[in-house]
Amino acid sequence: MSCSRNRDALTSRPVSIELISKYRTELMGIAMLLVVLFHGYVPQTSWFYGLKRMGNVGVDVFLFLSGIGLWFSWRSCPNLKHFYKQRFLRVYPTWLLLASCFYGFHFYHKSGFSNDVFDLLGDVTAHLDFWLHGELTFWYIPALMALYLISPFYIQLVNRNRLYTWLTIVPIVWCCAVAWIAPLHHALWHLEIFWSRISIFLIGINMSPYILQKKELPPNTRPLLWVMFLFPLVVACYLEQWEHGHYPLFINRMLYIPITISGVLIASEALQHTNKVVKQCWAFLGSISLELYLLHLHFILVPLQRHHLNYFVTLVLCLAISIPLAMLVQCIVSFTLKHINR
C-alpha cells in the first residue's frame, strides 16, 4: 500500500528541470562510467556490441552539462578575462601534465604519435594533430576548450534574444554539408566527432535559464520523456549493432541529442530518490571525471586489453587502477596551483 502511495506521489509531481543543476556532479559521474563502458573492447559480432557503443552518449552528457555549468559561471561573473582564466585553470594544467607524460613517452620510444619536436609541442599544448588530421587520442579536451572560447559570445547572444537559440540547428546542417559536399568532406570530415557535438553543448546553454527559473514540466510529460529516451536509443543501438561502418557516424550523434536531454531529466529524478551513499559515489566519480577521462583509456585500458581478459573484468580493473591515479593527479595539480598562486 505504501509503495503504491509513493509511486502515485512520484507520478503526480511535476518534472523539475532544476534537479539537473542539483545533481550535475552525480550526472557527470554517470557519464564518466558510460564513457569507460564505451571504450571497453567487444567484437562487432557480439550481441553486446551495439549496447556497449551506447556508452558514447556519455560524451554528449558531459557537453550538455558543461554548457549548463558555463552559463551559470558567466552569470555569476560576466567578465571575459575571469571566465577564460577559470576555465583554463580547470582543464589545462591537468591536460598539460598528462599529455606531456603520454606524448613525451611515445616520442622517446618513437611510437609514431609525434614525428618531431614541433609536432610534439603541438600535441602537448593544443593537440594540433586532432585539428589537422583527426587524431583522436585526447580529442575531447581541445574540443571542449574550443567550445569554452565561443561560449561567452553565444551566451550573451541568447540572453539578448532567445530567438538565437535556433542556432543549435546550424551545426546539424553543417554536419550534413560536411558529410555529403565533396570539397567540405575532403577538408573537414576528420573533425566530424567535434562538429556533431556542438548542438548538444549549445542546448545545455539554452536550457540553463529554465533551470535558474526552476521551471517544471507537467507530470504527464514523463511518458513522453521515456519515449524520447528509449525510441532513439533502440534505433541508435540497432544502427551500431547491424549497420556500423555503413553510414556517417554523425547520424548517431543526432540520435544522442534526445537521448541525452530526456536521459538526464530521468536520471535527475532517479537521483532524487536514490540512497545517499550511492549519490556520494556518483558525485565522487564526477569530481574526478576530467582526470579519469584523460587517464583511463590510453594509460590504463589499452595496456589491459592486451591481456584479453573478460570485458567486465577489464573494466573493473581499469576503474580500480584509474580512480586512485586520478585522485593523485588531482592532488598534484591542486598542490602545484596553490603554490604558484602564493
Describe each PLM feature range:
Residues 145, 296-297:
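Transmembrane helices and adjacent periplasmic/lumenal helix-loop junctions
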Residues 66-76, 206, 263-269:
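Canonical alpha-helical transmembrane segments
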Residues 37-45, 173-187, 232-245, 298-300:
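C-terminal ends of transmembrane alpha-helices
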Residues 23, 56-60, 133-145, 190-205, ...:
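Membrane-interface micro-motifs in multi-pass membrane enzymes
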